[in-house]
UniProtKB/Swiss-Prot annotation:
Residues 985-999 have a biased composition (Basic and acidic residues). Belongs to the DEAD box helicase family. DEAH subfamily. FANCM sub-subfamily. GO terms for molecular function: 3'-5' DNA helicase activity; ATP binding; ATP hydrolysis activity; four-way junction DNA binding; four-way junction helicase activity. The gene is MPH1. Its EC number is 3.6.4.12. It catalyses: ATP + H2O = ADP + phosphate + H(+). Keywords: ATP-binding, DNA damage, DNA repair, DNA-binding, Helicase, Hydrolase, Nucleotide-binding, Nucleus. This is ATP-dependent DNA helicase MPH1. Residues 194-362 form the Helicase ATP-binding domain. A motif (DEAH box) lies at residues 310-313.
């Protein structure tokens, strides 16, 4: 068991009491063993060495009292493992040591000698006849908890993992003690017990009003103020009057310096609140203000070590208490919570919600019947007075019932409402009936009927509240509500609601309003019998108290209109000075009270400026006014919390009287129901069996190895606390208001990952990869590092020899010689493939220059031919034959002889180039032909296309149409036969001379061009190749684009040529200006001639154009020559 747990459970039990509790279970066994014990062996007196004591089952946990001197020890036979308090008579026998046996001083391990209890223990045994009772006065059952057993509920679990140490900075010098102030007099046991548990657990304290909940909170706040260095302590209360009231009490009891405390509300500017959070440690504020400061970043949730929640029964639903605790727990788990209330809740579920929302692990609850607080509770005389309605009320009820009868009959006609008396209508009953009707027959009713019923429900619900005011509060509040209802309808433009106008025009309604207006003109008119009895009760109370007495009285009313009517009547009575105490909200007929006005009203009431305070629900909680001797509840509430809060305003320092004014019937039943509900809930909470406490949220702040001891002493109050009695609010100075509010601070929990998170990692629960930390530049220094000497930097002679031996020599060759390698012999290009890849490293990563070099080597390697990539030389010599292209010779000026041809020009090379080009073109044509034929099933159409080609060939040889651009259009027009024409037909793109293979066997295979004599035609002869290309649906621009695209892909795949001819613009790039294969063949037989106008042959197929070598620009020739069209099929060799 942990030491702190042991101390928390049994810290107030003396050691002797603990020994007694542990030995109770073995008393009976010890008594029976004494009767059956053997006679002890006698021995002589004298100093002897101490006998060894065998260990027992209690030796590890209980410290035995000191044993008697050795001369008085008398061994007694015992039962194994038993203890005895008195030795058996006749056990001592005097004799000499010589007569004693050898084993006289031996003791059996099975029969140990237990220690003899002290005289104090024996005196406590006689006090076992006391009876222990519960808080309700009943005797505890003996079989419920044995004397040597520990309670079942443990604050700490040994099987749970160790708690995380607190992040708060602690004052280790102060952790050894916790202070209990004695400034208020004698110590109350229940307060001491609650403070001790509240320091180490999240505690819910439920005490009746006036029993010192503020003292408990101030004591715990004082100790956490001592234990921590910079942590914040926050006291939250629902309203500013309650918070300001706790300021004076805590500063006057705990002795915390006033300079470290502040009061913050919504009226304090954010700039000043931010400054207070930076400089103060103790805060009194409302929960709404605390939530705003936490959300905007003014307050750090991790810095709050203690949160005191006043009126904790509000911590349900979506109230600000719940939001504050939830927000703080998102960032910090090391926080202590102390919840104070007089009424925890009216239901078991409500109390469990408070436990869950605040993280309560321990409950301290007392009732007025508890034994330990009975002596501190002053008597309260409760006087319940019931009333019957007055004659005026009966008359008004009758007239109003007649006016509402038509509307109620409409509901009865639809089987919605079965009541006969309209004065029994309630807002909740009408709302319930409306929901049930819409869920049943109303959902299928006609739209006109449905709209009419909704209008009736709306009118009756607004009037049901006025019926309640008439029954429980009087005629005047009832009349004010009806006057407002009438003015709202009459002020509307147009006709308004038909049903409302029907009600206002009813004769009974008009008669009732006129009657009430006549009564209200009378000054002595009281609209309710409660008002008459209230005035008499208050006047009698002040008369009995005397003229100079400081007695006070508080009247509670549920509605503001009733409170104002009560104040008007009481101020007309003698000895009464009444004032109203309401909330901040403005109503339709009156303004609310600001927090400053509320505080001033309470101070005047305490000082005697007013002796009667008429308050609404805002005065039910927390008001600590000791001189209140009379409480009058003008109306009863069904909530036991509100009822007990009202009663708790009296009897705090002396006996008080409570007067309940109830109407017979419903109001009286509500009071009895609330009273029974309160007693039942108190018993359930005291039992604690039906609640689940949150031990997991109540972490320990003080380290487990530290056990603070109580220090009961008088606490010195600083002088500054007594000199300045004003509230410690921040002052609104011009300098403070000129400061700008800091930007919103987003508090983050510990070990949270900020920034962008990988979506894939978030789905699979993997941590997101963090970006590499950018190294920071070295900091600049004012001093320079000393330059080391050259001898320390360079290699020494021995190091140089070792370096040359290891890195510059190879093993001996077969000729017994050592081969030396110099740095000049290193071949940096020996392993080109390895230089283009980053190799794997272990500890040292590749540098920036290494990555750049590898990238450069990789780029250079990819630019080479894959087949010749690793063949030396690597592209240093141009292997292209662009110089062997046939170029016309340059004629010398002034001479008729042709110029000398260049060294790269020869007929053999020219013929080889032409043959290779024709072979590549023929292979492409054959592959395309086979592909097109295999894909198409239109054999007949292919035959027609061949016939068209034959006709085109005959036309080309016999026709006399001139060659030119316009011929293409005419050729296309002549082609208008019924033959099938396929788009992008590559066979038709080529001319007749490229596809004919009938004369291949008659040729000798030479490149002289003799077999082409029959095909030589003039320049003015029209060829089929001129107009067949125009039938291709592809436009010339698209042909050129596709040609350039294919040419670009081929250049990137192969190695780049050494020489790249210039590219012409769009105006010069034309298919008509590109040389044809026939033109290249004709140039071999040409002779240099004078300048003439250039003539371009018909365009050839675009697919074969990629395989032709690049040509240099032609020079103008002197004479036009005939062109020879060559057939590439003749050069095809199998």
């Amino acid at each position: 068991m942990d030491d702190d747990e042991f101390d928390d459970e049994f810290g107030d039990i003396a050691d002797e009491d603990m020994i007694l509790a542990l030995t109770q279970a073995t008393d009976s066994a010890a008594a029976s063993s004494n009767e059956q014990a053997n006679q002890p062996r006698s021995f002589g007196s004298g100093p002897r060495p101490p006998l060894p004591r065998p260990s027992t089952q209690f030796s590890n946990s209980v410290k035995a009292p000191p044993l008697q001197p050795p001369s008085h020890r008398q061994p007694i036979a015992r039962a194994p493992g038993s203890f005895s308090r008195n030795p058996a008579p006749g056990n001592t026998r005097h004799g000499s040591l010589n007569t004693s046996p050898a084993n006289a001083f031996d003791t059996s391990p099975k029969r140990p000698n237990p220690p003899r209890p002290s005289a104090q223990t024996q005196a406590q045994i006689q006090a076992q006849n006391l009876r222990q009772t519960t808080l309700w006065g009943t005797t505890i059952q003996e079989d419920r908890v044995a004397g040597s057993q520990a309670p079942n509920s443990r604050p700490f679990r040994a099987d749970l993992p160790p708690e995380t140490p607190t992040h708060h900075e602690l004052q280790h010098d102060e952790l050894s003690t916790w202070v209990y102030p004695l400034n208020l007099g004698a110590i109350r046991d229940y307060q001491f017990s609650i403070v001790k548990n509240g320091l180490f657990h999240n505690t819910l304290v439920a005490l009746p009003t006036g029993l010192g909940k503020t003292f408990i909170a101030a004591t715990i706040m004082l100790n956490y103020f001592r234990w921590t260095k910079r942590s914040k302590i926050v006291f939250v209360a629902p309203t500013k009057p309650l918070a300001s009231q706790q300021v004076q009490a805590c500063l006057g009891i705990a002795g915390i310096p006033r300079s470290q405390a502040t009061l913050l509300t919504g009226e304090t500017p954010p700039v000043l609140r931010q400054g207070e959070w930076e400089s103060k440690r103790l805060f009194f504020m409302t929960p709404q203000t605390l939530m705003n400061d936490l959300s905007k970043g003014y307050a750090d949730p991790k810095s709050i070590v203690l949160l005191v929640v006043d009126e904790a029964h509000r911590a349900t639903g979506d109230y600000a208490y719940v939001k504050v605790v939830e927000f703080i727990r998102r960032f910090s788990k090391s926080i202590r919570i102390l919840a104070l209330t007089a009424t925890p809740g009216s239901t078991v579920e409500g109390v469990q919600d408070i436990i869950d929302n605040l993280g309560i692990s321990h409950v301290e609850i007392r009732t007025e019947e508890s034994i330990d607080i009975r002596q501190y509770v002053h008597s309260r005389n409760i006087d319940t007075v019931t009333f019957d309605p007055s004659d005026e009320m009966h008359e008004v009820r009758g007239l109003f019932s007649k006016a509402l009868k038509p509307l109620v009959d409409k509901l009865s006609a639809q089987n919605i409402y079965y009541g006969r008396d309209p004065m029994n209508l309630t807002t909740f009953g009408l709302l319930k009936s409306r929901q049930e009707w819409l869920a049943g027959p109303g959902g299928h009713a006609n739209q006109g009927v449905k709209f009419m019923m909704m209008a009736v429900f709306s009118i009756l619900q607004s009037l049901a509240h006025l019926i309640k005011l008439l029954n429980f509060h009087g005629i005047k509040p009832f009349y004010n509500g009806l006057a407002e209802f009438r003015s709202s309808e009459e002020g509307k433009p147009g006709q308004g609601s038909k049903l409302k106008r029907q009600l206002l025009a009813d004769e009974s309604f008009q008669r009732m309003m006129a009657l009430i207006e006549r009564w209200m003109r009378m000054e002595e008119f009281n609209g309710h019998p409660k008002l008459t009895y209230l005035c008499e009760t208050l006047v009698n109370h002040f008369i009995d108290a005397g003229e100079n007495s400081n007695t006070r009285a508080i009247v509670f009313s549920e509605y503001r209109d009733s409170a104002e009517e009560i104040v008007r009547l009481l101020n007309n009575q003698p000895l009464i000075r009444a004032t109203v105490f309401v909330g901040q909200a403005d109503s339709k007929r009156s303004e609310g009270m600001k927090q400053k006005q509320q505080i001033e009203t309470i101070e005047k009431f305490k000082n005697g400026g007013f002796n009667v305070l008429v308050a609404t629900s805002i005065g039910e909680e927390g008001l600590d006014i000791g001189q209140v001797d009379l409480i009058v509840c003008y109306d009863a509430s069904a909530s036991p919390i509100r009822m007990l809060q009202r009663m708790g305003r009296t009897g705090r320092k002396r006996a008080g009287n409570i007067v309940l004014l109830l109407m017979k019937g419903k109001e009286e039943e509500k009071f009895l129901e609330a009273k029974d509900n309160y007693q039942k809930m108190q018993q359930l909470i005291c039992n604690g069996d039906g609640f689940t406490f949150r031990h997991d949220l109540s972490t320990r702040i003080v380290p487990r190895d530290i056990r603070p001891e109580v220090d009961k002493r008088h606490v010195d109050i600083p002088i500054e606390n007594s000199q300045n009695t004003s509230l410690p609010e921040p002052k609104k100075t011009a300098a403070g208001l000129r400061k700008k509010v800091a930007k919103k601070k987003f508090n983050m929990p510990d070990d949270v990952e900020t920034g962008f998170v990988n979506l894939k990692a978030s789905f699979f629960g993997q941590p997101a990869e963090r970006a590499a930390n950018i190294p920071k530049p070295p900091a600049e220094t004012d001093f320079l590092v000393e330059v080391p000497p050259l001898e320390k930097v360079l290699l020494s002679k021995s190091q140089t020899e070792r370096f040359e031996r290891l890195y510059k020599t190879l093993p001996k060759t077969p000729f017994d010689k050592v081969q030396e390698l110099g740095f000049d012999d290193i071949n940096l290009g020996a392993h080109p493939a390895s230089q283009r890849v980053l190799r794997r490293t272990v500890s040292l990563k590749h540098g920036q220059y290494t990555r750049k070099c590898v990238k450069l080597f990789r780029t250079l390697g990819e630019s080479q031919d894959p087949l010749e990539r690793y063949t030396q030389p690597y592209g240093e010599i141009d292997t292209m034959s662009w110089k062997q292209l046939p170029v016309p010779a340059i004629r010398r000026r002034g001479s008729g002889q042709p110029a000398k041809q260049g060294p790269g020009y020869s007929s053999v090379s020219t013929n080889s180039v032409q043959a290779a080009s024709c072979q590549r073109l023929e292979r492409q044509i054959a592959s395309l032909t086979r592909k097109r034929i295999s894909e198409s099933n239109y054999f007949s159409e292919c035959e027609e296309a061949e016939e068209d080609e034959d006709e085109a060939e005959e036309t080309a040889t016999e026709g006399t149409t001139p060659q030119g651009r316009g011929g293409r259009g005419r050729g296309a027009a002549k082609r208008g036969r019924g033959g099938f024409k396929r788009a992008h037909d590559h066979i038709e793109d080529f001319g007749d001379d490229c596809t004919r293979t009938s004369d291949m066997e008659e040729t000798d295979g030479s490149d002289s061009g003799a077999d082409l004599d029959d095909f030589i035609v003039g320049d003015d002869v029209f060829s089929s190749s001129n107009w067949q290309g125009s039938n291709d649906p592809t436009t010339p621009s698209s042909s050129r684009l596709s040609l350039r695209h294919r040419r670009t892909e081929q250049v990137t795949a192969e190695e780049k040529p050494f020489y790249e001819p210039p590219e012409f613009g769009s105006t010069q790039d034309s298919d008509d200006e590109m040389p044809d294969l026939a033109e290249l063949v004709a140039k071999s037989a040409k002779k240099p001639a004078g300048p003439s106008k250039p003539r371009v042959a018909p365009p050839a197929d675009e697919d074969g154009e990629d395989d032709l070598p690049q040509l240099s620009p032609r020079r103008p020739q002197a004479k036009r020559r005939r062109q020879v069209l060559s057939d590439s099929d003749d050069d095809d060799t199998p």
